[in-house]
A protein has these predicted regions:
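N-terminal regulatory/sensing modules of transcriptional regulators
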Residues: 1-126
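Short, cationic motifs built from Arg/Lys/His that form the positively charged side of catalytic pockets
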Residues: 13, 72, 139-140, 171, ...
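Hydrophobic "lid"/C-terminal helical patch
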Residues: 117, 147, 190
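Hydrophobic patch in the ABC ATPase nucleotide-binding domain
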Residues: 122-126, 180, 195
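Helix-turn-helix DNA-binding segment
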Residues: 130-166, 200
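Recognition helix of helix-turn-helix DNA-binding domains
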Residues: 152-192
Length: 200
């Protein structure tokens, strides 16, 4: 199996490349840490599976989901596996919705990683493990993050150029989707789902 690995942390990338090759199931693993190098390599060589991180802030202005979309626009048949430490339901759903073949946590053992890659190669995925989540819109995410930071609602409405009544409607929609009834519950649920990072 030939793998293209894109991760912005060199130590992790180089170490994983070495371990994958040592697994004997992977015949070739090409590691890149910059977006330009990734797309050049992707176009020039053929790979069975592409391993892609979500957080690529040290290597690209885009995140892994955006890179995933670019990959599939170039070659819709590409098998892309998201390999990330962000093991949250909302990220898993987004990954599969955008066409990822699998979503794997970086904390898994090498044995499990290889087995999951074998499954991907055989066109098998883990869709049945993805919970049914009603995804928030981009505007709802902005509002959720603002209220969780403690921003005054009047200020939030002004910044978004909407009335306070419209803002309250958005907030109620957010609560309904998250199945919560107040800001504290919304904050805890948002962290669990991956919409926001903990404040501490």
């Amino acid at each position: 199996m030939k793998i293209l690995l894109f991760d912005d942390h060199r130590l992790f990338g180089e170490s994983l490349k070495k371990l994958l090759i040592e697994s004997q199931f992977v015949s070739f693993c090409y590691y890149v840490e910059k977006e330009n190098d990734f797309f050049r390599t992707f176009r020039e060589k053929e790979f069975d599976i592409i391993l892609l991180d979500i957080n690529l802030k040290n290597s690209s202005e885009k995140n892994g989901f955006e890179i995933l979309a670019d990959i599939l626009s170039i070659n819709p048949d590409s098998k892309v596996v998201i390999l990330s430490s962000y093991d949250m339901p909302i990220y898993k759903k987004m990954a599969f919705d955008k066409g990822a073949a699998d979503f794997i946590n970086k904390s898994v053992s090498m044995e499990e990683l290889v087995e999951r890659l074998k499954r991907v190669l055989c066109n098998k995925t883990y869709y049945n493990k993805i919970p049914n989540i009603e995804v928030l819109t981009e505007r709802e995410i902005v509002i959720l993050r603002a209220i969780c930071k403690g921003d005054v609602k009047k200020k939030i409405a002004k910044n978004l150029f909407i009335s306070e009544r419209t803002l309250y409607n958005h907030i109620q929609n957010i609560y309904d989707k998250l199945e919560v009834s107040n800001t504290v519950e919304a904050y805890n649920k948002a962290i669990k789902l991956g919409y926001i990072e903990p404040l501490m």
